[in-house]
Amino acid sequence: MEEYQGYLELDRFRQHDFLYPLIFREYSYALAHGHGLNRYMLLENIGYDNKSSLLIVKRLITTMYQQNYLIISANDSKQNPFFGYNKNLHSKILSEGFAIIVEIPFYLRLISSLEGAEIVRFYNLRSIHSIFPFLEEKFPHLNYSADILIPYPAHLEILVQTLRYRVKDASYLHLLRFFLHEYSNCNSLIITNKSLSIFSKSNPRFFLFLYNSYICEYESIFLFLRNQSSHLRLTSSGILFERLCLYRKIEHFAEVFANDFTGIPCFLKDPFMHYVRYQGKSILASKDTPLLMNKCKSYLVNLWQCHFDVWSHAASIRINQLSKHSLDFLSYLSSVRRNPAVVRNQMLENSFLLNNAPNKLDTIVPIIPLIGSLAKAKFCNAVGHPISKLTRADLSDFEIINRFLHICRNLSHYYSGSSKKKNMYRIKYILRLSCVKTLARKHKSTARAFLKRVDSEFFQEFFTEEGGFISLIFPRASFALRRLYSGRVWYLDIIFINGLSNHE
């Protein structure tokens, strides 16, 4: 029964909404590291002593609260590197505890809301590519889109206030506020892109939780107003937890504009409005007129400024006509184009041709940003001329080729749904020639001389198309199957953007 002691304590603290004591429980950090309570119990018996031990956590919190925590002698830091003030170690240890503990109320609330209901898991919806079939189905029938760059909160207090409606433990929120302010800068509490980048890399789980809470607050209010104004309730939105004083906040927000809450903005009543988001970028598409789209733009800017105290300017939202402009989303350039088609129709003895031009969503590979990513990774220069990869010249030939092929396959799979493959062929050519130049430099030869020495099948996989693999595996595959495979394919197992294609 000892192995369940930690879980019983978690449940007892949850009943009283106490999270602060969990920071001083060592099993919280064991769970944060993925060890589990069973492993924690075993390690405790043999003298569990790592950087997340209870004694170190207590001393770090005490040090953080002291007024003179920056005055630490160099000798003390050398003698006790864990107890001396190390900002990176300090923030990493505490943020791991904050992340695992603050998720407990949300997880338990989710479990209680799903009691007695069958949980249906759609694993394919985790894929980034699952967004594009939705876009292909809905966007060809729409007229305008708003390309929205969601602003980051300019002050750390906004993140704490967002959690205040969900976490009731004042002591925990006070320590969280103190930790965030101390970590950012004692002189500046303004979040900059540089500080966000450093914080997200050193504390990824904690940063993602805070940012997702902020995004969830913004989207839940927007969807709430959307549902109140529409007779067609949204069925595809995820589970949104109810927050305290939501209606009071909405009413206060309405008072800012001197409008009654019952006066729903007219653009929200559009039944053809669709919204998609990934990370900090979202698209709001509609069949409305440009006037209503501009009203929607002003509404969103006021929502961020008046409700979230986030400074946002009109340039962060660009309204474009789908038939004339492309959308830069998820490293694709998507645009609605007319697809002309001629259909022969025959009625009794008369036959005639029908010219049909339905709208179609085209997704193409953005060649210029992708070449910029390849140049940054030293595969080519700024204009796209391949160069040798110096850091891989000390590897074996087999390892060099495999690493280049791995990058090529990942990019090929990610852009498999592209309407036009020409840009992808150019990227493959750059990677292939960069691989050849790397091998030639390793063997102290020229690229032309190296290609003459090796077998013609040495780089065959660089030229093998995606449709060619099905011919190798199924030699007697039908023509229809080959044509289907060589067309646009959305892989539903891609859960993150390739590093080279993530140029946003």
Swiss-Prot record:
GO CC aspect terms: chloroplast
Q: Which UniProt keywords apply?
A: Chloroplast, mRNA processing, Plastid, RNA-binding, tRNA processing
GO MF: RNA binding
Keyword Iron appears in the UniProt entry: no
Q: Where in the cell is it found?
A: Plastid, Chloroplast
UniProt entry tagged with the keyword Transcription regulation: no
Q: Name one GO biological process term.
A: tRNA processing
Question: Where is it mostly found?
Answer: plastid
The record's InterPro entries line, in alphabetical order, gives: Domain_X, Maturase_MatK, Maturase_MatK_N
According to the UniProt entry, the coiled-coil residues are none
Which family does the similarity line name? Belongs to the intron maturase 2 family. MatK subfamily.
Q: What is this protein's function per UniProt?
A: Usually encoded in the trnK tRNA gene intron. Probably assists in splicing its own and other chloroplast group II introns.
Q: Which PANTHER family match?
A: MATURASE K
Q: What is this protein called?
A: Maturase K
- Organism, per UniProt? Quercus ilex
Biological classification of the source: Eukaryota, Viridiplantae, Streptophyta, Embryophyta, Tracheophyta
